[in-house]
Amino acid sequence: MGKFTSFLKRAGSATKKALTSDAAKRMYKMAGKTLQKVVESEVGSAAIDGVMQGTIQSIIQGENLGAQFKQAVILNVAGTLESAPDPLNPGEQHIIINVSEIERAEKEDRVIETHNKKIIERFGGHLLKIRKIMKGEAEAEQLEGKEMMQVEKALKGMLRIGKDQSERITRLYRALQTEEDLRTSDETRMISEYREKFEALKQAIELEQQATHGEAVQEMLDLSAEVIETAAEEVPVFGAGRANVVATTRAIQGGLKLKEIIDKLTGIDLSHLKVADIHPHIIEKAMQSDKIPDNRLAMAIKSKVEVIDEMNTETEHVYDPSCLIVKKEYEKHDNKYHVNIPSALKIHSEHTPKVHIYTTPWDSDKVFICRCIAPHHQQRSFMIGFDLEIEFVFYEDTSVEGHIKHGGAVSIEGRGFRQAYSEFMNAAWSMPSTPELHKEKMQRSLGSHPIYMGSMDYTVSYEQLVSNEMKLVYDTDLQMHCLRGPLKIPKGTLMNALLFAVKVA
């Protein structure tokens, strides 16, 4: 468990802090006239930063502030419908989620209709029966008394589809790690096919970046549907088809309505089981101008395998203990569905494995807190708080609340969310740089519980989420890019950096 605090770095923001710092004033006196000239020069802001970091020599030699800014791109693709809205705007969140779900449902229906026979051959016809039940195409009487059987079929189907995807991508990962002379003909063909997709993704990103100004944070790469769909499935389930009906694992699983029937009949919400269509590490490699060797591309592929395996482990965790609990609930009602069953197995929405967003009751526009909860089987969480008024960030690993999804006792490691939130508030208002009015509002907020603003799904592994967060805490170059623009923009950029990471080229 860990706890870290830091000041965010905004270009030019260090000048005021440095000039008013007693320690800095002593440094200036010791440095003499040379430093005074630098401080008074046009690059004063960069010079002050250089003094505090011990790099005044580079400033004196003429390095300017603009040179610190490079092209920064959020490692996400617009066409994948996974953008992060303003964390403090629930209305915007709701609209984006609804639009994304409508577009995704249309895409999933096309995939199921096109690859109907192949899905039956590979995963079994019983999964298509579940889809018909959920779409109202089958009579309700077919489900009565067989609810538990359908739940088990859906969970087994999810696991089978997930493991099939893991096996396919793992074969590609291992093939990329194998010496070229030792590869089989199938491995060579698999790598050749994936290289074609990767090069198409790489070229599309290069064209997109050419239109991006060097001093802008590109919110997201806007690529064509053809590039996204083909690159999203590293090793095709059934082989490539027309661009608008490429059968991705995510589309098959969503189109079969497996999560929906589990939620409807048991109250078990599995909406957090999502994998990025194109993993941020693959986008990062595609952004590089040089040719990517097989071993480096293999490590990017491995990142996606880790997410898939994490989701499969979570499905197994739900299947083993939760099915026993569900069966007991059904036995209480003669093995038939009853409206009380889902409510008995529901957990509080703030305890689900997502990124939960909070703000303070006062000065809400300047402060937001994210509580990131790991999949249920990991029993982990962390909190990261941002105070944009004083450019302060606070991180702490936190314990999770015990509930029915954990399937037993919960090990308590570290403090709870409320204690971590209180320390963040205490630390923020007690900083010497905190304006008096902001300090009063933070003190007032300290006595109240934070306001819940909603949640967002993350599509990378929990470990990757922690890694993204640590970069936000320590990487000053990244912070300068994330904190540019009016207040609304930094909030959205920070959320995107947390969920997907940002590449500073």
Curated annotation (Swiss-Prot):
Keywords assigned by UniProt, alphabetized: Capsid protein, Outer capsid protein, Viral penetration into host cytoplasm, Viral penetration via permeabilization of host membrane, Virion, Virus entry into host cell
One term of GO molecular function: structural molecule activity
GO biological process: symbiont entry into host cell via permeabilization of host membrane
Pfam families: Orbi_VP5
Region (Involved in membrane permeabilization): 1-42
GO cellular component, one term: viral outer capsid
Cellular compartment(s): Virion
Membrane-spanning intervals of the chain: none
Family that this chain belongs to: Belongs to the orbivirus VP5 family.
Protein task: VP5 protein is one of the two proteins (with VP2) which constitute the virus particle outer capsid. Acts as a membrane permeabilization protein that mediates release of viral particles from endosomal compartments into the cytoplasm. Permeabilization activity is probably negatively regulated by VP2 and is triggered by endosomal degradation of VP2 and exposure to low pH.
UniProt name for this protein: Outer capsid protein VP5
